[in-house]
């Protein structure tokens, strides 16, 4: 894919919100270049809100360019105020350092999981250079290039200042200087020519372009990605239970897969463009095939498979699909211990119990019945299954527990709960 094809593809996918002149970008990227995107450590894992910039780095990688993932070990100690309603809570240095390590490992694994050469990705920590800066030198050499008038006129800052109950601290106000310095440093050390980021980062990116020109005498470029919203206008990326994480110990591959599988018909083709490497022609073929198909579209399954494979690999995808099929068929007997652990994490309502607990009580505590009377009716009508076997007795749990610890309760075809026996060694 040549440079013109790369940027045409990005535009067709709707992945460019703002940029420096595209003609200059196309010309610049006609030869191999270096680009970067920053990720501040605000938790021990990235979430799906980080996927579009990660995949953008990957798209440039696949076109023969070198990607830098910058982990903000320094900037993460401050927090970006851009379009935030309140001052960020400051985390301890030890916490931030651990998160930096976690994110660096996670990003490296994601960006090299498809078999590419590790040399095409560089993960760096801006604490390695910002931590060595002398304060007076920074004010003299960097601070003098920033106009306070221009900084307070940024929309992201004006919104905070306009709120009578909120101001902005000097700590957060200085964030833009540090991010700008990152760009200048990466340009000087690695020849970095492009910074990408979310649409809320445009002001910081432009400041970095200006500072790089002043410090290094070099013209560099910037590009932002759109804010991803659903068809109803709401921000995409969270569920009722919170963020959807990329780390399997925080969001299981099964729950991750289900999240994409439940994409709305009005969103799914756009999401295929944003979150997969399928060509726009292939996506249009899927759309047309779905329009002719009687029944459920295939686009959601294709989306879920591609994104889950990218984040969790073939093994994670296979596990998510096995769990999905097991719950659909009602036969959970072939699930592995690790797959049942996924259901315990976030796949099903989970209730701790002992073997002597009444099934009536468990149906109540799990939410499968609203009263003992209703629970008895479900049992008498043969609507309750335990580990796939129909049960009509009210007594305690009996029979074979999966891996001596789990029972899957099922009411009807679609209502499930997981029972975990207490007091077992993990």
Swiss-Prot record:
GO terms for cellular component: cytosol. A motif ('HIGH' region) lies at residues 41-50. Its main location: cytoplasm. Transmembrane segments: none annotated. Keywords: Aminoacyl-tRNA synthetase, ATP-binding, Cytoplasm, Ligase, Nucleotide-binding, Protein biosynthesis, RNA-binding. Residues 357-421 form the S4 RNA-binding domain. It catalyses: tRNA(Tyr) + L-tyrosine + ATP = L-tyrosyl-tRNA(Tyr) + AMP + diphosphate + H(+). A motif ('KMSKS' region) lies at residues 235-239. GO terms for molecular function: ATP binding; RNA binding; tyrosine-tRNA ligase activity. ATP binds at residue 238. InterPro entries: aa-tRNA-synth_I_CS, aa-tRNA-synth_Ic, Rossmann-like_a/b/a_fold, S4_RNA-bd, S4_RNA-bd_sf, SYY-like_C, Tyr-tRNA-ligase, Tyr-tRNA-ligase_bac-type. It is found in: Cytoplasm. It holds the Pfam family tRNA-synt_1b. Its EC number is 6.1.1.1. L-tyrosine binds at residues 36, 175, 179. One of its GO terms (biological process) is tyrosyl-tRNA aminoacylation. It comes from the Bacteria. Belongs to the class-I aminoacyl-tRNA synthetase family. TyrS type 1 subfamily. Homodimer. Catalyzes the attachment of tyrosine to tRNA(Tyr) in a two-step reaction: tyrosine is first activated by ATP to form Tyr-AMP and then transferred to the acceptor end of tRNA(Tyr). This is Tyrosine--tRNA ligase 1. The lineage of its organism: Bacteria, Pseudomonadati, Pseudomonadota, Gammaproteobacteria, Vibrionales. The gene is tyrS1.
